[in-house]
Regions:
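Amphipathic alpha-helical coiled-coil segments
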Residues: 11-14, 21, 81, 88, ...
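Small/polar, glycine/serine/threonine/aspartate-rich low-complexity segments that form flexible
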Residues: 2, 39-63, 186-206, 231, ...
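Periplasmic alpha-helical coiled-coil/stalk elements that build and connect Gram-negative outer-membrane
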Residues: 74, 90-209, 321, 325, ...
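Sec/SRP-type N-terminal targeting helices
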Residues: 12-13, 29-30, 68-96, 122, ...
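Gram-negative outer-membrane assembly/targeting C-terminal domains
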Residues: 387-403
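Hydrophobic, well-ordered secondary-structure elements that form the walls
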Residues: 213, 247, 276, 293, ...
Length: 403
């Protein structure tokens, strides 16, 4: 998971968006403070009367301005930028949660594939042993050639199923390589070292969750903060249609000297006072900007509602899948146990001649199907817990325990 967070492009994009939002927030906060600028110049020129008099002049100026936030536009802009920064941070958390869940689900799929492959390999050994014994009986004249064909075909079927399962396991490894950014040898080494760590889901039943768990989802929090930013932008746009008041100040230092030994004339001047800007005519531009801000708010509100509805649906659907898988697991364990016993009994009967090969192969298919079904259900149950972790936004257990 750590490797996935370090190397995943989605997380890198989320980090870049956070940096951009943080810079924008800093720029907006700076608008509430005075600005001070300085300038300096020096010039030298000759007179136009043909004389040799050279005039040198120097000028230095310091300008200061401070906009008075009469209508709260600057404060609204700061709220909007802060909300956008929080929204981008929540999107980063959402990306991390999504990547963690995807890595976990792929890891579970790989371990389940390993279990399937092991079961199929054991089945292949059993099929090949049956084929070997049947061939001996056929050559000795105690069994019909058709029975040899059947067992050989059964062994071939088992081998191709095992090969397909091994290929699926390799595909899961390829997915982990893409998710984590590790090389394939590194990924295989990590999986081999942690082979004893098998995914295990909790055993308790969960039928409902507090509604507060929805609000802690990063995507819901991001949508809510985006809505807050859009609301603040309406205040900014409306305030732009009102008069603006600023305090302006200026200090200038100058010096003039003629060529020769003439003295240098120095001086300074200053000014300070308010400046009032009145929007008189702009061909409806400011009104249009206010309408745009309102439309953006309506869009953000609709998106927030959609995100919340989708979040509720995702949590409820995951709970249904989780509880159904948990109930099915009990019967799957029973089915596997009984089909194992049935196959062993059929194998013993077939070797004593009281059961046909068709009965044995039917028992084998049922045994393998029950074992594969149990493995798939275990994977489904575990991945349902992972999906629930993602659906409620990640570390919901800690928050629930704290409450």
């Amino acid at each position: 998971q750590q490797a996935a967070e370090l190397n995943n492009p989605s997380i890198a994009q989320a980090v870049a968006r956070i940096d951009a939002a943080r810079a924008a927030s800093g720029a907006t906060n700076g608008n509430m403070l005075p600005t001070i600028n300085g300038s300096a110049s020096q010039s030298r020129n000759n007179g136009n009367d043909g004389s040799d008099i050279v005039r040198r002049s120097r000028l230095g100026t310091i300008d200061a301005s401070w906009e008075i936030d009469l209508w709260g536009a600057l404060r609204a802009g700061r709220r909007a930028s802060d909300a956008q920064l929080t929204a981008r941070t929540m999107e980063w958390h959402a990306a991390r949660t999504s990547i963690a869940a995807e890595v976990a689900q792929t890891y579970v799929a790989y371990r389940a594939c390993q279990a399937q492959s092991a079961a199929l390999q054991s089945d292949v050994v059993s099929r090949e042993e049956t084929a070997r014994l049947t061939d001996l009986l056929v050559h000795a004249g105690f069994s019909a050639p058709a029975e040899g064909y059947l067992t050989d075909a059964s062994a071939a079927t088992g081998r191709q199923q095992q090969i397909a399962s091994a290929a699926e396991c390799d595909l899961n490894i390829k997915s982990l390589v893409a998710l984590t950014g590790l090389s394939e040898p590194e990924t295989r080494d990590v999986l081999t070292k942690n082979a004893a760590i098998q995914p295990r889901a909790p055993e308790f039943t969960l039928t409902a969750l507090p509604i507060d768990t929805i609000s802690q989802r990063p995507d819901v929090a991001a949508a809510e903060r985006t809505l807050a930013a859009a609301s603040a932008q309406i205040n900014v746009a409306q305030a732009a249609r009102l008069p603006r008041l600023a305090l302006l100040g200026n200090i200038s230092f100058f010096g003039i000297q003629l060529s020769g030994d003439s003295p240098q004339a120095n001086g300074k001047s200053w000014s300070f006072g308010p400046s009032l800007s009145l929007p008189i005519f702009d061909a409806g531009q400011r009104a249009a900007q206010a309408d745009i801000a309102k439309a953006n708010y309506a869009e953000a509100l609709a998106n927030y509602k959609q995100v919340v509805v989708s979040a509720v649906k995702e949590v409820e659907s995951t709970l249904i899948t989780l509880n159904a898988a948990q109930k099915r697991l009990r019967d799957a364990h029973t089915a596997k146990d009984k089909f194992d016993k049935y196959f062993n009994a059929s194998l013993a009967r077939q070797r004593f001649g009281s059961a046909s090969l068709l009965e044995l192969e039917d028992a084998r298919r049922n045994k393998l199907s029950a074992e594969q079904n149990l493995i798939n259900l275990k994977r489904e149950y575990t991945t349902s817990w992972i999906a629930l972790y993602k659906a409620v936004g990640g570390s919901w257990l800690t928050q629930t325990q704290q409450s």
